[in-house]
Amino acid sequence: MWKRMTAKAEGLYIADTKSFVTKQMDKLDFDYGGIPGDLHFGLTKKAGAREPMFSRGTEIFNRRQISIVSIEECNEIALKMGVPRILPEWLGANVAVSGMPDLTSLKEGSRIIFPSGAALLCEGENDPCIQPGEVIQSYYPDQPKLASAFVRHALGIRGIVCIVERPGAVYTGDEIEVHSYQRKVKRKAERV
């Protein structure tokens, strides 16, 4: 069973330098592998700290072609951390949406469809790491220990990672359809 929701693309971003911090764009072209020119582009990637089951450097499938955050969750993280704001680009996001205050809880396998027909497949939560925390710290140098606070406060609200299921152009302001797969849980009968 599928549940349909809507959201709006408030911002589009690309990491086209060696830094994971993204810069704002009006349009992006999604291709198999992600966003051409983006730091995370590719069908495969080298295994790192997030894939401890593989030797570091092993070539594996790239589940993080696109990163999405919600404006509502960014605001919630900022509130928890006691800072005025957290921008999507500080988190390395490629897409910032509004209208989905629970974006991070979107189930794996959910689809995000743009007006052009471009489609993303949700691969799950983007676990918080220290790098965005260090960027946030650089904007608020008078508040100590924000880097580590980010990891703690962003858990469960940091956004999601996706792969491109269907290429296409996306634009700031696009109305997005989200199709979330709602699994029915079957319980085994208890033995008496």
UniProtKB/Swiss-Prot annotation:
Residues 15-179 form the MOSC domain. Transmembrane segments: none annotated. Pfam families: MOSC (PF03473). Gene3D superfamilies: PK beta-barrel domain-like. GO terms for molecular function: catalytic activity; molybdenum ion binding; pyridoxal phosphate binding. This is Putative metal-sulfur cluster biosynthesis proteins YuaD. It comes from Bacillus subtilis (strain 168). The gene is yuaD.
